[in-house]
């Protein structure tokens, strides 16, 4: 379970197989990896859906009492078991003491968000004063863009990756429209090279170098929602700032997935949601980051009561005393029930640590990649077997836990057959199925079972064809 820092996941799998005197695809390898996994007990902190409860399942094909193979934490994380307890604490407080709950208890409602910010700082690599928990991701993105995007006649572009997540795309379009700018001229999108699925860092840096003088803001994903590509955040940040650009990131698919060091990397601003890898539930409270170097120079364009210093907030004299930095961007009081959900998950992250989770994730996803390539790589095409292509980068530093896979047979059919058998993943246009083994609650045996099911489905498709 503890490969050297120089050992690739495939080498680890093969080494363990040799030690066990079995083939690398043998179930014993998965069981051994789980036995050696020091994080395996964290799975017990989550509710794992039962196969029998999932709507698409065909009960004639499965053991209904088994747990589902849940590989969709990149869309919605599983529920931490402590969520219900924490929600009941606040509901009970509301019932018993009503308005006094604003100021007393484990989570005084007026500072509920602040009570858990300390648990977030190591996940994103920031100081507490650089983080605010508020709103939803796109709302925060708009609030930050209103302050960071100040176009001039010479510097008026926003640089982003082509096929960014639709909400980011729409947000950027509307920000440009707000300033009366021509979208085609001002929205600079970088596309992969012909015949490639992902972006090369050298191509991103070349565009920044050549066009940086006309770019006001660079806004990239930390991890791309479709391809699973993990962008080189420090390199993009350094290059952009060297050309005078502000550099921000949408970390929806990066936070809780890969290690982040936003402060040390000098990132100007960032936003993230909490319902994917952070397991805070659908619509969970989102997060925002502004580097401390901007605390006294970047001000919110839109202000609310909760951006006012708490010490004088209740003077009610309507004389704004703005909190420096990102906390000054807070508009309304924190939704305490959403805080509870996030709190339950962040406590687990605190115990597990991002460094340990990332180490497991590299091996967990690497094991998945190894089994897929062994069974259905491109070199199998000569055998007329269906081919499974992984479009996510193979270098571990260029991806998180997600692999996006395509098939030489209709992916809709493969997806439906996986769902019937209790596998929870998703398909995304144009033709990908996203599979994300999450180190907090997925096991190596989950990966083994998934690839076995995939093999039986594809073998069946081969027979039909």
Swiss-Prot record:
It is found in: Cytoplasm, Cytosol. One of its GO terms (cellular component) is nucleoplasm. It is an enzyme of class 3 (hydrolase). Its EC number is 3.7.1.3. Inhibited by o-methoxybenzoylalanine (OMBA). Its main location: cytoplasm. Optimum pH is 8.25 with DL-3-hydroxykynurenine as substrate. Expressed in all tissues tested (heart, brain placenta, lung, liver, skeletal muscle, kidney and pancreas). Highest levels found in placenta, liver and lung. Expressed in all brain regions. Its cofactor is pyridoxal 5'-phosphate. InterPro entries: Kynureninase (IPR010111), PyrdxlP-dep_Trfase (IPR015424), PyrdxlP-dep_Trfase_major (IPR015421), PyrdxlP-dep_Trfase_small (IPR015422). The modification N-acetylmethionine is found at residue 1. Keywords: Acetylation, Cytoplasm, Disease variant, Hydrolase, Pyridine nucleotide biosynthesis, Pyridoxal phosphate. The keyword Hydrolase applies. The keyword Acetylation applies. GO terms for biological process: 'de novo' NAD biosynthetic process from L-tryptophan; anthranilate metabolic process; L-kynurenine catabolic process; L-tryptophan catabolic process; L-tryptophan catabolic process to kynurenine; NAD biosynthetic process; quinolinate biosynthetic process; response to type II interferon. Pfam families: KYNU_C. It comes from the Eukaryota. Changing residue 198 to A: In HYXKY; reduced 3-hydroxykynureninase activity. Pyridoxal 5'-phosphate binds at residues 137-138, 165-168, 221, 250, 253, 275, 305, 333. Induction: Increased levels in several cerebral and systemic inflammatory conditions. PANTHER family: KYNURENINASE. Catalyzes the cleavage of L-kynurenine (L-Kyn) and L-3-hydroxykynurenine (L-3OHKyn) into anthranilic acid (AA) and 3-hydroxyanthranilic acid (3-OHAA), respectively. Has a preference for the L-3-hydroxy form. Also has cysteine-conjugate-beta-lyase activity. Homodimer. It is linked to Hydroxykynureninuria: An inborn error of amino acid metabolism characterized by massive urinary excretion of large amounts of kynurenine, 3-hydroxykynurenine and xanthurenic acid. Affected individuals manifest renal tubular dysfunction, metabolic acidosis, psychomotor retardation, non-progressive encephalopathy, and muscular hypertonia. This is Kynureninase. The lineage of its organism: Eukaryota, Metazoa, Chordata, Craniata, Vertebrata.
């Amino acid at each position: 379970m503890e490969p050297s820092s120089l050992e690739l996941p495939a080498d680890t799998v093969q080494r363990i197989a040799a030690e066990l005197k079995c083939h690398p695809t043998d179930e014993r390898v998965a069981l051994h990896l789980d036995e050696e996994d020091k994080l395996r007990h964290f799975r017990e902190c989550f509710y794992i859906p039962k196969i029998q409860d999932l709507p698409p399942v065909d009960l004639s094909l499965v053991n209904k009492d088994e747990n589902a193979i849940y590989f969709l934490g990149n869309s919605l994380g599983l529920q931490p078991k402590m969520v219900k307890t924490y929600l009941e604490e606040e509901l009970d407080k509301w019932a018993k003491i009503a308005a006094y709950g604003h100021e007393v208890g484990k989570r005084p409602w007026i500072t509920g968000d602040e009570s858990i910010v300390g648990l977030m700082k190591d996940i994103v690599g920031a100081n507490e004063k650089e983080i605010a928990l508020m709103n939803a991701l796109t709302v925060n993105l708009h609030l930050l863009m209103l302050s960071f995007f100040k176009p001039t006649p010479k510097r008026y572009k926003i640089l982003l990756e082509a096929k960014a997540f639709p909400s980011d795309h729409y947000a950027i379009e509307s920000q440009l429209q707000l300033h009366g700018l021509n979208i085609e001229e001002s929205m600079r999108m970088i596309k992969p090279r012909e015949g490639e699925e992902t972006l090369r860092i050298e191509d991103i840096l070349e565009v920044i170098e050549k066009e940086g003088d006309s770019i006001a803001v660079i806004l990239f994903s930390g991890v791309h929602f479709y391809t699973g590509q993990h962008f080189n955040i420090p390199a993009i940040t350094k290059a952009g700032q060297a050309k005078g650009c502000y550099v921000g990131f949408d970390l929806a698919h990066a936070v809780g997935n890969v290690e982040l060091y936003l402060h040390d990397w000098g990132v100007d601003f960032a936003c993230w949601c909490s319902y994917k890898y952070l397991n805070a539930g659908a619509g969970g409270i989102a997060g925002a980051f502004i580097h401390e170097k901007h605390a006294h120079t970047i001000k919110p364009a839109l202000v609310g009561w909760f951006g006012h210093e708490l010490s004088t907030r209740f003077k009610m004299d309507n004389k704004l005393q703005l909190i420096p930095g990102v906390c000054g961007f807070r508009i309304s009081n924190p939704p305490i029930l959403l805080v509870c959900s996030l709190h339950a998950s962040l406590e687990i992250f605190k115990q597990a640590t991002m460094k340990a989770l990332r180490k497991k994730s590299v091996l967990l996803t690497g094991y998945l990649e190894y089994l897929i390539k062994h069974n259905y790589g491109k070199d199998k095409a000569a055998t007329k077997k269906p081919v499974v292509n992984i479009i996510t980068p193979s270098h571990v530093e260029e991806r998180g836990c997600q692999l996006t896979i395509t098939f030489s047979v209709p992916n809709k059919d493969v997806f439906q057959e996986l769902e019937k058998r209790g596998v929870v993943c998703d398909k995304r246009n144009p033709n990908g199925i996203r599979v994300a083994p999450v180190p907090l609650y997925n096991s190596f045996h989950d990966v083994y079972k998934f690839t076995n099911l995939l093999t039986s489905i594809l073998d069946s498709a081969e027979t039909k064809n």
